[in-house]
């Protein structure tokens, strides 16, 4: 049986993974649980690891994976967490274009059953490559890790997002949408030809596509050259 604090931490990590696709930082977890130091978070994570609910990946920033969810978290009512993330709202491009239709899975937040997410080829976490291809296969996911809406998955190729915990060979689960907030990790279609997985930043009237690896430069483009194809909401890794 988990303690109240352990359950609260697991809920918070699950919530942030659902909202942003990446785990929270230790400072964010400390603030969310109203703890005075990060050592308390380390103890909670160690306890959850020992019980088989979390896994930490060595030498990776924010590399925490939720392995399983206890019934109290998966089926019980969600609790309000005191932490409120600071979000910078991003505006729409001056000439929004409707994204190309894609096979997607519609996820109901009230469903307790696994849903099938179509895998739509590969996405570059490095130099942009062609992506958003035809459906090659599907992957089953618990709706607990997904927000409502339509979703598809892409296989990551490259290492430009490693400091965000996204590795070559991972499957990224994308919520289909054509707008995003500054700081979101998105699938960006450049010049209607190349797709890449990057963090979105707004720089005046321009859009910056930012890597999470210092070996890669940030690309700054006009809004007419970039179309958002979706936002990262979850990640799947096989061992």
From Swiss-Prot:
Disulfide bridge partners, by residue number: none
Family assignment from sequence similarity: Belongs to the peptidase S24 family.
Biological processes per GO annotation: DNA repair; DNA replication; negative regulation of DNA-templated transcription; proteolysis; SOS response
Naturally occurring in which organism (per UniProt): Methylobacterium sp. (strain 4-46)
Catalytic function, reaction form: Hydrolysis of Ala-|-Gly bond in repressor LexA
Full protein name: LexA repressor
Annotation: DNA-binding region: 26-46
Gene that specifies this protein: lexA
Keyword flag DNA repair: yes
Record keyword Transcription regulation present: yes
PANTHER family (alphabetical): LEXA REPRESSOR, LEXA REPRESSOR-RELATED
GO molecular function, one term: DNA binding
EC number: 3.4.21.88
Top-level class of the enzyme under EC nomenclature: hydrolase
Its job: Represses a number of genes involved in the response to DNA damage (SOS response), including recA and lexA. In the presence of single-stranded DNA, RecA interacts with LexA causing an autocatalytic cleavage which disrupts the DNA-binding part of LexA, leading to derepression of the SOS regulon and eventually DNA repair.
Entries under InterPro entries matching the protein: LexA, LexA-like, LexA/Signal_pep-like_sf, LexA_DNA-bd_dom, LexA_repressor, Peptidase_S24_LexA, Peptidase_S24_S26A/B/C, WH-like_DNA-bd_sf
Site entry: Cleavage: 125-126
Assembly with partners or alone: Homodimer.
Keyword annotations: Autocatalytic cleavage, DNA damage, DNA repair, DNA replication, DNA-binding, Hydrolase, Repressor, SOS response, Transcription, Transcription regulation
Active site, per annotation: 160, 198
